[in-house]
Amino acid sequence: MSAGLETFALKEEDAIKLLACQTHVGAANCDFQMEQYVWKRRADGIHIIHLRKTWEKLLLAARAIAAIDNPGDVCVVSARPYAQRALLKFAAHTGSTPIFGRFTPGCLTNQIQKQFKEPRLLIVSDPRVDHQAVTEASYVGVPVISFCNTDSPLKFIDIAIPCNNKGVQSIGLMWWLLAREVLLIKGKMTRQTGFVLDDKEIMPDLYFYRNPEEQEKEELAEPREVKEPWPGVPPPEVAKIDEVVRSIGMYQTIGGVEPAKKLDFSMVEPVSDWAQETERAVQLDAAQQQEWGASTQNSNW
């Protein structure tokens, strides 16, 4: 289909990427409608996908996506955990609407639902896993583009891109290639510049799934560089602690702690003997009672 145009021909670099990510490795089973995309079958029963046909269907899907005037009318769906990162990157670069995770039934058919959408085109990662979205798209007449393995059913699929849709690197590479071809057809990039957006080169591994546990292990395994402070300048940790200590009224220096200042008790009354104070209070009370009694006897009622 694209053999006459050198611009859209399969390059050696892209073919190496497809082989390195095992995009050509299919499944042991093969659907009768997917036999046209199979090159041959290995001795262990695994079907090998014809990469030239994969590339041709990828270009056809890119042309269909680029034909939509409003990129937001293109809806991308994936329920596979390791395809959601690629899906979000594709949506960010092309402007399409992502639906990742579980697809809520009625999202395309139930108009009173909060998540109701009316897309003009639907793209899924696996027609078997995302069967709910494919079925609802058939009810409302929305065309569907799907990445299909050799054992994937093609019912309600308008454009099937044969590839290994179960591999972590394979599915990420296919989303990356699809986004690149869409932007190329729209004229936002060229073959000479490569996949460059906002002066940043978009590499295929940006679309690959990354396990959070492995990321934490890599961060812990990386050696951290300890920068030596300038002479006479305290390290940032010590300077921060010193600032906090000074803010609460205590004075701490880098070399040690300054001696505590003596408190001035001249304004405080000296503490007296509590026993003497008690006896004095009792005597004053008795004297007052005697005065009250004398005034009562001498008073003339």
Curated annotation (Swiss-Prot):
Upper classification of the organism: Eukaryota, Metazoa, Ecdysozoa, Nematoda, Chromadorea
Taxonomic source organism: Brugia malayi (Filarial nematode worm)
Chief localisation class: cytoplasm
GO biological processes: ribosomal small subunit assembly; translation
Function: Required for the assembly and/or stability of the 40S ribosomal subunit. Required for the processing of the 20S rRNA-precursor to mature 18S rRNA in a late step of the maturation of 40S ribosomal subunits.
InterPro entries for the chain: Ribosomal_uS2, Ribosomal_uS2_CS, Ribosomal_uS2_euk, Ribosomal_uS2_euk/arc, Ribosomal_uS2_flav_dom_sf
Subunit details: Component of the small ribosomal subunit. Mature ribosomes consist of a small (40S) and a large (60S) subunit. The 40S subunit contains about 33 different proteins and 1 molecule of RNA (18S). The 60S subunit contains about 49 different proteins and 3 molecules of RNA (28S, 5.8S and 5S). Interacts with ribosomal protein S21.
Family designation: Belongs to the universal ribosomal protein uS2 family.
Cell location: Cytoplasm
SUPFAM superfamilies: Ribosomal protein S2 (SSF52313)
The name this protein goes by in its record: Small ribosomal subunit protein uS2
Pfam families reported for this sequence: Ribosomal_S2
Top-rank taxon, per record: Eukaryota
Keyword terms: Cytoplasm, Ribonucleoprotein, Ribosomal protein
Molecular function in Gene Ontology: structural constituent of ribosome
Gene Ontology cellular component terms for the protein in this record: cytosolic small ribosomal subunit
